[in-house]
Amino acid sequence: MAMSSLRRLVSLLRSQNDLIDIFAPVDPYLELPEIHRRVIENQGPALLFHNVQGASFPVLTNLFGTQKRVDQIFSKVPKGLIPQVIHLLSSPPKLSQLWKHRNLLLRGLSLGLRKARFLKFPHKKMASVDLHQLPMLTSWPEDGGAFLTLPLVYTESPSSKIPNLGMYRMQRFDRDTLGLHFQIQKGGGMHFYEAEQKNENLPVTVFLSGNPFLILSAIAPLPENISELLLCTFLQGSKLHYKNDPDTPHPLLYDSEFILIGEGICNERRPEGPFGDHFGYYSLQHDFPAFKCRKIYHRKDAIYPATIVGKPYQEDFYLGNKLQEYLSPLFPMVMPGVRQLKSYGEAGFHALTGAVVKERYWKESLATSLRILGEGQLSLTKFLMITDHHVDLDNFPKLLETILSRIVPERDLIIFSETSNDTLDYTGPKLNKGSKAIFMGIGPAIRDLPHKYRGKSLPNITNMGTFCPGCLVLETTLQQVNIDALLNHPDLSSWPLVVLTENLNETLASSKDFLWKTFTRLAPATDLHVRFSNVAHHRPNYTFPILLNSLMKPHYPKEVEADETTIQKVSHRWNEYFPKY
């Protein structure tokens, strides 16, 4: 179904009992997000809240809360569409063959924007700018305020005019000011930097849209010179209608519920945060640019789209998977040494990436690894797992086992200190600063991996288990652990990888839990420990085990958790929200 129309999508999901209308009064401060979290945890339907306290507009959440629903929403996109494009680009057809590719060529004609000359603009202007009229959510008890959680932030480069549509959370500061949480390696932040270099404000337009293709495109890691609007229109198969406005150089998209027009203020910063983010922890308060809102448009029957982020699985996980499904065929074209590539949403995407690569000559895998770490937002990858063995990247235990049976640590373990880091990842010494590691397992297997620890007792270890062959998980505490004693323990030398955790049962409950608890809680430069006997040719002679200290450190932000008052309130009112269920 072509579900760029939010109202048609809502009607269809309602008819399939995959959307529930909630008419009970609900507070956008903590209560609504807690309802949402319980529903998405149980793979439940989309939610349309009609009676949000203090607001004139209904709130839609959990639109992307299951993989099945995401697949249905984007089912108009033909399977194999991107591979067809790649084939067409790599082998341009002869004139006589164009008819065979007519559907793809017609889709190409749908790219971009179309000025709506005869369509009435479906929005009206808010009498005066008042951001308090929007039902912004406070999702977690220690959040610094209410946030736009699905804003589509449109900017243009002051020099080239190349546009960017990105998704950056926006905290409400007052009736006409929002924060601009521009993260590194994102286009909006690049444009703001350009504007400040010229001592100018940056025109910014914020769309709140229920068009799934716009939302998906806004989170796509596209090259800086490719517009997200092109991807949106290519996937949905139709142009986006727009009109001009005298108060902004930007197009106003008809496919929006709300449109906020304003600018990022040059050289002005406001304390932004904390905010419980998609890593599952609070991102802390830092100074970020401010957006001054000059005008607000909204549909007469506007629906406010929102999402809640936190520990996986949330809506961003399912959207991220769909996006990787579409974009993964492009990786071998952009990076010829790559066969497959996947970033793991269970670890916040940027914390962990796996790749199957080619090894057509000695250490081609290293060249490809560096190519991956130099490619756009992939440059924020913290751990990169590489093999040339054909393995299903969706099966992370198998990928890790494949690498551990092949890795030669003094050759295939590479650590980079003093690198950039995802803005939301606090494992490094400062904001946006961190480190990286590459694990490579190339060629045939060279060892049999242990499945169970059979050695002597380990100092200050209270429990242990295996995640996969070759990976031993040890339960301990930060206060008790003795890293050197573990590295030098003779009975651990046969284990390529050892992981430290506070709670073994929680960590080994599932692959999702292992990924989240392991890779969101360590920095390679400070928390990856390994022995080496000497340094030769500027390389340490590493020996097993490689130890990952994934214990919570004192400087890490807290995990996001709902407060007890809200938990009890939602439990008490549950039948009010869902009287028919």
UniProtKB/Swiss-Prot annotation:
GO molecular function, one term: carboxy-lyase activity
Pfam family name, one: UbiD
Any single GO CC term annotated in Swiss-Prot or TrEMBL for this entry: cytoplasm
InterPro entries assigned: HBDC, UbiD, UbiD-like_C, UbiD-like_N, UbiD_Rift_dom
PANTHER family: 3-OCTAPRENYL-4-HYDROXYBENZOATE CARBOXY-LYASE-RELATED, 3-POLYPRENYL-4-HYDROXYBENZOATE DECARBOXYLASE
Family assignment from sequence similarity: Belongs to the UbiD family.
Name used for this protein in its record: Uncharacterized protein CCA_00454
Lineage per the UniProt record: Bacteria, Pseudomonadati, Chlamydiota, Chlamydiia, Chlamydiales
